[in-house]
Amino acid sequence: MIKFILRVFASLAVALALEPGVAIAATPDSPETTVKAFYTWYLQQGGSVYQLTDSHIYNYVAKPTVDNLRDDYRHKRLPGGADYFTRVQDIDPQIWLKTMTLHPAIALGGTVVIPLTFGLGEKQNLVVFVARENGHWRITKVEDTTGYQGFHQYDPMD
């Protein structure tokens, strides 16, 4: 019995040591695993298909969020000229996948807020909001940590 327990412990230790990416305390269906799985999928899509129009996005993002973003896309109303989920125009998916760092989550009522960082030199910090939808964790909103940009650039001469 002791040998069995030692083997299980050793196997678990090896598995955890070999696990790539960010060490997060997460269950198979947790806010953290949803966010990590989403960005892994999203960044690996590259130019093959526009992720917002891919039906797989519903596996990670809440239906009302996707539907509103798709409507904005159809009517050319997506804000800021940057990707909604990355908040930048150009990225290197390989670097972003390697540097993806999930920070400790904060639960506020039924919503979980997860800070997320990408990049090497100039880092991109995001705040991802996740809530339950039909029993599964889904992303409801993504914000960056830069100051308010508005819909136009501030002109002090205005």
Please state what every model-predicted region is.
Residues 14-23:
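C-terminal segment of classical bacterial N-terminal signal peptides
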Residues 1-10:
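Bacterial N-terminal signal peptides that target proteins for export
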Residues 106-115, 120-127, 133-134, 139-158:
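Low-complexity, intrinsically disordered terminal/linker segments enriched in charged
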Residues 46-56:
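Surface-exposed patches in mature extracellular/periplasmic domains of secreted proteins
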Residues 29-47:
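Short, aromatic-enriched amphipathic alpha-helices that serve as compact interaction elements
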Residues 26, 61-122:
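Surface-exposed, charged secondary-structure patches
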Residues 26-31, 49, 118, 122, ...:
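Extracytoplasmic/periplasmic, Sec-exported soluble proteins
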